Amino acid sequence: MVDFLPKVTEINPPSEGNDGEDNIKPLSSGSEQRPLKEEGQQGGRRHHRRLSSMHEYFDPFSNAEVYYGPITDPRKQSKIHRLNRTRTMSVFNKVSDFKNGMKDYTLKRRGSEDDSFLSSQGNRRFYIDNVDLALDELLASEDTDKNHQITIEDTGPKVIKVGTANSNGFKHVNVRGTYMLSNLLQELTIAKSFGRHQIFLDEARINENPVDRLSRLITTQFWTSLTRRVDLYNIAEIARDSKIDTPGAKNPRIYVPYNCPEQYEFYIQASQMNPSLKLEVEYLPKDITAEYVKSLNDTPGLLALAMEEHVNPSTGERSLVGYPYAVPGGRFNELYGWDSYLMALGLIESNKVDVARGMVEHFIFEIDHYSKILNANRSYYLCRSQPPFLTDMALLVFEKIGGKNNPNAIQLLKRAFRAAIKEYKEVWMSSPRLDSLTGLSCYHSDGIGIPPETEPDHFDTILLPYAEKYNVTLEKLRYLYNEGMIKEPKLDAFFLHDRAVRESGHDTTYRFEGVCAYLATIDLNSLLYKYEKDIAFVIKEYFGNEYKDENDGTVTDSEHWEELAELRKTRINKYMWDEDSGFFFYYNTKLKCRTSYESATTFWSLWAGLATEEQAKITVEKALPQLEMLGGLVACTEKSRGPISIDRPIRQWDYPFGWAPHQILAWKGLSAYGYQQVATRLAYRWLYMITKSFVDYNGMVVEKYDVTRGTDPHRVDAEYGNQGADFKGVATEGFGWVNTSYLLGLKYMNNHARRALAACSPPLPFFNSLKPSEKKLYYL
């Protein structure tokens, strides 16, 4: 039996006139060769105990917790364990001696994986002796732009030699190409995070079909990384806020509704358990006004969410624990409004209904205690809502947890719809959001001053003329304006509309700038139409066709809500539908005129089911060609966005960017009206773009994409950049609604399309290669 550890080798960049073979050298172990026995292990032979093969070898695509867990660590296995007898592994994992012996062939820099006769179809297993050193030398060789990622923009040799497990690391094979090398970097980074110093690594894990790899990571890793659940030990960390940098924001802080004493005591206990965390706990008043919310800007905090009682099965001790929820990712580390709905779709698809159900519970809690579904659960969002999706979300969770056959599911559905009806009446059908003349609703949040969660310089171009007018610095002007010490009606109007834009979820876009609070939009009114239809259905099916509102005492039946839906549909057609263009436009309630901004939100009318068959046909024929790009639907047309300049910078919710919510709702809406082939075509475009970025850019999955770029669609230079792009070594979260879009988009793909995506076949060449009968599947 060997008594030392094998080594990994790398290839250095070739010198002139040398293609690289002479530059191969072993990675140094960083220490003297050392015994492969557990520390403290006694010498001498033990009787061999036969172990099952399942105990020894795992699915190469196991979760990281299993794959890099202690049971696969050679240093933690007994001397008799096969993982600690690497020389004998060839008995179980045969690799051709011919292949292993052929090391004297020329290494070439290629952009693809090694598909030569020396390849073994991903069945090989590697042995890496020193994970830290392997990481350092891999990055030194391949990460030429020094961003801790291996991408197509790096100019390294794109090849490395890795020792095989069967040969105890003495024989080597090549790992080639950006995709495999970046996957190797990711796996080494993950292994290091688990404290591993040595690993066995299946080639199949770094040469995995990229479509399978991404969907697997979303389901098994990304959702886990994005899931939060408040308990006594993590609340201080969850409460921290990277968006606010003021002295009062240094300490984590939690605000609790005035009528939740049990939660208040829970958080006090958490603060006392670890005083060094400096967790501050405060009650909110019964009446929350815009003035009060502004007063919290210097001392922002997390808002309490729904909790349930947990009983320790061992001790019988009772304690509170938060329902689970998912956060979008990046700088967004809270429970967001419409992000949560879109993530719930993916969570349900991934059989993680407990998290989706938890978010329904949180929305019920928010409506009950904060009067609305919040933009997110931070104190500075108390006056601001987001696009309402609760009814559809509750119905999806209801069906997933047993539907009408589960009494608990029925109770959850009823509670969710009581909350949704309250939200409908008190938020969307009340002043200032309801326009009494048209009967349609607008995004129109309350608030005073400058939104504190924005970047410090976000509004500098707007504020600079006022700073010059008062002869003060921008910082001083912000203070004077927020404190009401200067009065500027135009600035007040600007921030009124800016807050409305943020409530819309589309922050920011030129279609809303300076007018949002006055616009009756097709997106919001489509959602409210869906609320009315869903409420009518649930009242009929689960309330005995009679619903008594506990807040205002009114009694309604399903017919009442159907009438409301039909009335809204009539008003939408009157004020928004434009047959000539095939778009539902927005209606300016102040100027009493229809806008002409061509937006992808026109497809929300199909998702909600309010468009007629003829309107859907016209939308597909006229509006769709204006919005369909290389990578799917663009947020708006270039014509509507207008010219871009230093004084008129690009906005992230405008051309040329595409967003997952627009794709998801359009796919479902088109399918509902018989245009599933169109949805399939759009889905292929969107999935191609995500897959290409994932393959070429170190497993990157980002918040939004430039749907006009074929090479680097993840590169978005607008406003605060692109969440999900800034990571070292490995991306562990993706981005919430993009994760969902990938899983849902794959449901439209047949095997042929999945193979094309895995090969990163661009949409047009792929579509052109199809047979006439196959083109029909994509409405071509």
From Swiss-Prot:
UniProt key word Manganese: no
SUPFAM superfamilies, A to Z: Six-hairpin glycosidases (SSF48208)
Location of the active site: D507 (proton donor/acceptor), E703 (proton donor/acceptor)
GO cellular-component term (any): cytoplasm
Cystine pairings recorded for this chain: none
InterPro entries linked to this entry: 6-hairpin_glycosidase_sf, 6hp_glycosidase-like_sf, Glyco_hydro_37, Glyco_hydro_37_CS, Trehalase_Ca-bd
Catalytic activity, as annotated: alpha,alpha-trehalose + H2O = alpha-D-glucose + beta-D-glucose
Modified-residue entries (Phosphothreonine), positions: T88
Binding locations of substrate: R331, W338, D339, N375, R384, S385, Q386, G505
EC number: 3.2.1.28
Annotated GO biological process: trehalose catabolic process
Pfam families: Trehalase, Trehalase_Ca-bi
Phosphoserine modification, residue list: S52, S53, S112
Keyword annotations: Glycosidase, Hydrolase, Phosphoprotein
Superkingdom classification of source: Eukaryota
Keyword Hydrolase: yes
One Gene Ontology term of the molecular function aspect: calcium ion binding
EC class: hydrolase
Ranges for region Disordered: 1-48
Family: Belongs to the glycosyl hydrolase 37 family.
Note in the entry: Present with 2500 molecules/cell in log phase SD medium.
Name the UniProt record assigns to this protein: Probable trehalase
